[in-house]
Regions:
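Residue-level detector of short, conserved catalytic/binding motifs and their immediate flanks
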Residues: 93, 447, 748-750, 814, ...
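Buried hydrophobic-core signal for structured, non-transmembrane domains
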Residues: 387, 450, 597, 750-754, ...
Length: 846
């Protein structure tokens, strides 16, 4: 079934097909009082009805629960921060694994390893020997484009691509597959779907949204919830089903400037019309959980917004499931910390998501706050009753333990061929053809084809963020058994037809090809880290454009396959391409691209382009929030655009290439670690000749350990722990040299923030390395200071310190490394090379 685009989107309320289930909002409501609440926010006809037997069971369970047992139900720690014995002692109501968190910290954990951890936690939770409780816990995970934390899983195109398919039935199939693969690892609950209506494409989570059109978001939300959970008429939360979460409530796609965790200043009518339609769809379909958002609404953090969480969501819309927080999001509420936040639970939060060691003081403080009356007993009881309601509906109080469930440990489910076939279909249907000069496509598969670009044979790049690791970084093709890179898909089709497919990321060749297919685009990122200042692609250093132009100048026809998590300003790249495809982030089944761009051997079309833009495409870098039905709507490609074979492409090679950025082209800071290591840089530990890539949140190399921590937001810093190592080293590096001479000419500096927990026991060496041997060690021991208040400090080193010692900045392969041979506990954040700022604790080496 295909979705027909709506003809109009009234500024007031979307009263389309989806909203026939509810009363459409009063168009004239302006304020937020009680009457206006009733007018703006609908009472939903939710598919899952109240069951008196379930309610009586909740009452029976709760009458025997102690205060401590009740509070344990509202605490959700992370697997890196608790042990099985902690679960046995406290009986947490739920727990999670964050992105990049695995059983035993092993990125390559098998389905059996996941099942073993699930079983251990389950058995500990029902063991009443220490906490007196037998209520089973439940495990939540971010399975946002398939079971994306697990090696070998089927990874689907990200939501922005699925929006281009305009096919909610396909979305439902994807949800069913995801549920099965998640259940095969013993997990009960997934934190999906994201139902943000994205209005500013600078937001780093744009690719998690299906569309800028709220109607599409609402329809998709209903489809994916039904696929994950089933329906009351079709095996609701039965075998093969998981608990769904609609997130993030509310308005995360509409913050000022596209700022992640920023402020949404829409009026209340727009908040409903634009940003609430995913909840209308998802909750009506019976979603059992809602995740509160990091963002604010008019300055008030959603984790503490009682009006929206309780008055709107629970009381008016009729949601009777549970509201879970996001990663220590409660700590951002005014007057709160990660360790204490009665404001959040009083506002309507039912579960604190509390990674890090903050879970223990939070639990203790919450118990004391209930005892003192700061948190009313009735509010705690309501939260616990909601948690139990979800568990009972999901069968968790009656089902066998994780290792004894129907799909548990079935390895053949993970990445099953029939699952990959659905993912490949999704890739085909999501591709949007933006340009096809002289009907270059489809290509004859018997040609001599050059396959170029950094994304050609890079499954990690084509899969994007939230892929094995949180940011999607640190992955290699071998981390994706059973997957197909875009090049591999092309090579298979071309070889079968008697043609030749040559992989050359740099675009070099021996025999001139008939055509070049260049796969390029954004490097993986996730929330926060993906926020950008404007929509210009490869702002500053346009290496991909240089590749396209070099091929075009040699008379080679160029097909561009653009990998991105959002529409970007690519006018120069469009001009340098004969055909241009928006491929989004297709996931593990790269063969879907070859399915469409090549004809059959007899010249007949095998699969046509059917994808249509669900996001408007900008005509300038600063057209950051161009959306359908906007006043003066003038994108480069409008919502719904997408060519098919045989249609005339009117786009020439004369698009304006004026970036309109003016002085913004000046030398900018080079971020090395900004909430995560920045592509193309990578991190590694080494000791005694043993090098260990940092591709997970906890990594060890003999006596040197790396662990991500939270400074301001999730995993935006990391701790290095040396234990009398034999010169253990941490470094940021690249496989290819980078020319950093422009920074030296600008009196540049290397700078980072740090926390030091102990005085260095031995010399601490800071080094910058280049392609050829270039010794540049600096002993920074005396500059690292232990701060008694544990405040962050900055250390800034002039680049001249390195060049004076012989560093060649024209060929830098490691811009920073730190090594020592003594005990040291050092935490780092915000690492960059920048023009001289004359700030911080500057080391000049004069």
């Amino acid at each position: 079934m295909k979705v027909n685009s709506i003809n109009t989107l009234a500024k007031a309320s979307v009263c389309a097909a989806l909203l026939t289930l509810v009363a459409c909002a009063d168009q004239t409501a302006k304020s937020t009082g009680a009457k206006e609440l009733a007018a703006i926010w609908p009472k939903l006809d939710i598919a899952v009805k109240t069951d008196p037997k379930v309610e009586q069971r909740i009452t029976n369970i709760m009458q025997d629960m102690s205060l401590e047992q009740k509070v344990a139900q509202v605490i959700q720690p992370e697997i890196r921060d608790i042990t099985v014995e902690d679960m046995r002692r406290y009986g947490f109501g739920s727990y999670l694994n964050g992105g990049g968190s695995f059983p035993q910290g092993n990125k390559h954990a098998t389905p059996g390893d996941w099942i073993a951890l699930a079983e251990s936690m389950y058995q500990a939770s029902v063991d009443n020997s220490m906490d007196g409780s037998t209520i089973p816990t439940m495990w939540g995970t971010d399975a946002v484009h398939g079971h994306n934390n697990v090696i070998g899983a089927t990874l689907f195109p990200h939501n922005i691509a699925l929006g281009a398919t305009h096919n909610p039935e396909l979305i439902k199939q994807i949800a069913r597959v995801t549920a099965k693969e998640v259940l095969a690892t013993g997990i009960d609950w997934i934190f999906a779907p994201t139902v943000a209506t994205v209005r500013d494409d600078r937001w780093g989570r744009t690719y998690e949204g299906y569309s800028e059109d709220p109607e599409i978001v609402g329809q998709y939300a209903a489809a994916i919830v039904e696929g994950l959970q089933g329906t009351p008429e079709d095996n609701f939360l039965g075998e093969g089903r998981v608990i769904a979460t609609v997130k993030h409530f509310l308005g995360d796609g509409g913050t000022v400037g596209g700022d992640d965790q920023g402020d949404n200043i829409n009026d209340e009518q727009s908040l409903f019309d634009i940003h609430a339609q995913g909840y209308v769809g998802g909750l009506t379909a019976g979603a059992q959980t809602v995740m509160a958002s990091f963002n604010s609404w008019h300055g008030d953090k959603l984790h503490g917004n009682k009006y929206l969480l309780t008055s709107v969501l629970k009381d008016r819309m009729g949601f009777d499931g549970l509201v879970v927080g996001d990663w220590n999001g409660h700590g951002q509420v005014a007057g709160c910390s990660n360790e204490s936040c009665p404001q959040s639970i009083n506002a309507g939060l039912d579960i604190f998501m509390v990674p890090t060691g903050a879970w223990k003081p939070l639990m203790e403080n919450t118990i004391n706050q209930v005892k003192s009356g700061v948190i009313p007993q009735s509010r705690l009881d309501d939260a616990v009753s909601r948690i139990l309601r979800v568990k009972i509906r999901a069968g968790l109080l009656d089902n066998p333990s994780p290792e004894n469930r129907a799909l548990a440990g079935k390895k053949d489910i993970i990445g099953a061929p029939e699952h990959r076939a659905i993912a490949r279909q999704a890739v085909r249907e999501s591709l949007v053809l933006l340009k096809n000069a002289k009907q270059l496509l489809p290509l004859d598969p018997s040609l001599n084809v050059l396959v170029a670009g950094g994304g050609a044979d890079n499954i990690g790049q084509q899969s994007g963020g939230w892929t094995i690791t949180w940011q999607g970084t640190g992955n290699e093709n071998q981390d994706f058994p059973g997957a197909t890179s875009i090049y591999a898909g092309i090579e298979k089709v071309v070889t079968a037809a008697g043609g030749t497919a040559t992989l050359s990321p740099s675009g070099t060749y021996q025999a001139k090809p008939d055509v070049a297919i260049v796969i390029f685009g954004e490097q993986p990122y996730a929330e926060g880290n993906g926020d950008i200042a404007n929509l210009e692609y490869q702002r500053g250093k346009k290496t991909d454009l240089a590749l396209l132009r070099s091929l075009q100048n040699k008379g080679i026809a160029v097909v561009s396959v653009f990998l991105s998590g959002r529409p970007l300003w690519v006018n120069p790249e469009l001009n340098a391409s004969d055909a241009f495809i928006a491929a989004w982030l297709p996931g593990t089944e790269g063969g879907g691209i070859a399915d469409v761009i090549f004809s059959q051997q007899d010249g007949e079309i095998k699969h046509d382009f059917t994808g249509k833009l669900s996001f408007s495409w900008p005509k300038s870098p600063n057209q950051t929030n161009v959306n359908r039905y906007d006043k003066d709507y003038m994108p480069l490609f409008p919502y719904g655009f997408g060519l098919q074979y045989g249609e005339t492409s009117t786009l020439g090679n004369d698009l304006s290439e004026d970036s309109d950025n003016g002085k913004q082209q000046a030398l900018m800071a080079l971020a090395l670690f900004d909430r995560s290591v920045q592509a193309p840089w990578k991190m590694a530990l080494s000791e005694q000749g043993n090098t260990v890539p940092i591709n997970a949140s906890v990594v060890s190399a003999k006596s040197l350990q790396f662990r991500t921590i939270d400074r301001r937001v999730q995993e935006d810093a990391f701790q290095l722990q040396w234990q009398q190592s034999t010169s253990g080293q941490w470094r940021i590096y690249n496989d290819f040299p980078e020319d950093l001479r422009a920074f030296s000419e600008a009196d540049g500096v290397l700078t980072f923030d740090y926390l030091l927990n102990n005085t260095p026991a031995a010399a601490v060496w800071l080094q910058m390395s280049c392609m050829d041997e270039c010794p540049s060690d600096l002993d920074i021991s005396e500059h690292l200071k232990v701060d008694a208040t544990q405040d962050w400090q900055s250390l800034t080193v002039a680049l001249s310190c390195f060049t004076d010692k012989g560093a060649d900045l024209s060929q830098v392969i490691s811009p920073i490394s730190i090594r020592t041979s003594g005990n040291l506990n050092l935490t780092l954040s915000d690492i960059s090379i920048r023009p001289d700022t004359a700030n911080g604790n500057l080391i000049t080496c004069d």
